[in-house]
Amino acid sequence: MDITLSIPDWIARELSHYPEFLLTHEDRMRMIIHFSKLNSEYGTGGPFAAGVFEQNTGKLISVGVNIVVPSNCSSAHAEIMALSIAQKKLEMFDLGSPGIPSHELVVNWRPCAMCYGAVLWSGVRSLVIAGSGKELE
């Protein structure tokens, strides 16, 4: 049996409005927060989004959103989606491999225990978090 998870179609459309490089953490976070809001507005998942960027250049590698409910998959959190897409795109499971740029994960909310574990295993060098608290737990 195969397992296939797909991000919503609107993401590609929205990404076309953004530059390839987002130079500041503020710009990266602004984009991720925008995607988290759109995910709720479009009804394609919960209010969570994440992005993988090259740490020093701000090059956007991937964006993921929460698709737990539409995919019937409890592990389809935004962080997992963003990391998985980046790993497939770069054709490597270790985003901290020698010889490649350092990567960071930008998230709109504090990761859960599962996602935090995935962050550690992914090899990203930095985790940038917009907020935390009971409001979205």
Give short role names for the model-derived ranges.
Residues M1-E41, P101, P111, G117-E137:
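Zinc-dependent deaminase
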Residues I32, A49, A82:
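Conserved hydrophobic/aromatic pocket- or pore-lining residues that grip, position, or stack substrates
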Residues P47-E54:
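Short beta-strand scaffold segments in enzyme catalytic cores
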Residues E41-T44, F93:
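Surface-exposed helix-capping loop/turn segments at secondary-structure junctions
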Residues S62-E137:
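Zn2+-dependent cytidine deaminase-like catalytic core
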Residues Q55-I61:
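Short, glycine-anchored, charge-dense loop/turn motifs used at functional sites
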